[in-house]
Amino acid sequence: MAGRGGSALLALCGALAACGWLLGAEAQEPGAPAAGMRRRRRLQQEDGISFEYHRYPELREALVSVWLQCTAISRIYTVGRSFEGRELLVIELSDNPGVHEPGEPEFKYIGNMHGNEAVGRELLIFLAQYLCNEYQKGNETIVNLIHSTRIHIMPSLNPDGFEKAASQPGELKDWFVGRSNAQGIDLNRNFPDLDRIVYVNEKEGGPNNHLLKNMKKIVDQNTKLAPETKAVIHWIMDIPFVLSANLHGGDLVANYPYDETRSGSAHEYSSSPDDAIFQSLARAYSSFNPAMSDPNRPPCRKNDDDSSFVDGTTNGGAWYSVPGGMQDFNYLSSNCFEITVELSCEKFPPEETLKTYWEDNKNSLISYLEQIHRGVKGFVRDLQGNPIANATISVEGIDHDVTSAKDGDYWRLLIPGNYKLTASAPGYLAITKKVAVPYSPAAGVDFELESFSERKEEEKEELMEWWKMMSETLNF
């Protein structure tokens, strides 16, 4: 079972069926219109994709529809509940759903963190349906992705905020209504501020990764964290995610770490140790979006400052400083590299534009997903072939390490080049290997570590052999 508070698929679907909507019957919740009131239901439909806004009951229905169509490669689970009790639903697509396969990287998309930024929510619903459709058609790219990657899609991290924003009359929505969760908390300012810690560690020495290691209990006890924030923190800690994107709205740009500036100034390029690969990852998204990558595109609003934008990408701190954001939290608390993608100048654009947004972003969403198969991957084992979990894999010249998962598997995103990788673990002798990294696929580098106890036994045997040889030579 993936994710804290997750429920088994059959239990979830059983509950949904009991509510009478699994196969299309009406579902209702307080303050929401009945799903049967279809609002020009199926306004624009193409290959099973309904280009319309999905309220909470309709979102659940859409995900279950994908699962019913592609049961062999999909699973629905929840990582927790919002403040008002709505489930934070995830649909997983994999050739072995529900299972972490050793050596297979884990990917996630998260949408609708700000409830009134609605395009990402809909694009992820569309993406789930598209992946299912194309898999069944035998699309080689999609089949290979699903067979080699465990894909997790959370359309809405802030379902309460979305319902508030969507409940406003008319198509023109307020710029701020629904942005925060039901407690009034901005979720993208609510994560533990690990940037401050790593900036101190850069100067004084200290860890450069996994800065919340073994601190789940402290997270649970922190009353300043929203339930949505806590749920995602546990999700990040429970699954060995490698790559992620957080979909927002209000501009057109792919934003990469660090989001918070080192000096505390409002605008300052704040590079992470992995600045090169983050720039490449951001371009992998923006380059396939014609509007985002257009160098002649005017700013979304007259007085907007997009001077930091290059090829549809920007460093977060150079644009504006964001403390407590989810993007940097992923990078500094886990092995997961995340960017933030702003999808639209309008936060809640008219429904009839959703199909155009899908067409503009479909190839970008797939291109970004493919980036997970870059860099280096492999296993860390002992001399008997047993996996070594939590081994550290460091790259010479890059002050950010990753660690191996429970099966000893690891993934390290890198741009093409020649590198020295070192694997180390407590009680073992470290090993360094050289590797030439292509653009893709990821180069395979395995490590077999010798324990100190094995080395002592080996040295003892060597000493005994030497003593025996000397005794025979000197006849004593």
Swiss-Prot record:
Q: Which residues form the signal peptide?
A: 1-25
**Could you name the domain of life of the organism this protein comes from?**
Eukaryota
Where does the record place the catalytic residues?
Answer: 342 (proton donor/acceptor)
Q: Provide the cofactor list for this protein.
A: Zn(2+)
Provide the residue positions that the database annotates as binding Zn(2+).
114, 117, 248
EC number(s) given by UniProt: 3.4.17.10
Which positions are cleaved off as the propeptide during maturation? 26-42
**Keywords assigned by UniProt, alphabetized:** Carboxypeptidase, Cleavage on pair of basic residues, Cytoplasmic vesicle, Disease variant, Glycoprotein, Hydrolase, Hypogonadotropic hypogonadism, Intellectual disability, Membrane, Metal-binding, Metalloprotease, Obesity, Protease, Secreted, Signal, Zinc, Zymogen
Annotated Peptidase M14 domain ranges read 52-372
What family, per the record? Belongs to the peptidase M14 family.
Q: What does this protein do?
A: Sorting receptor that directs prohormones to the regulated secretory pathway. Also acts as a prohormone processing enzyme in neuro/endocrine cells, removing dibasic residues from the C-terminal end of peptide hormone precursors after initial endoprotease cleavage.
Q: Output this protein's name.
A: Carboxypeptidase E
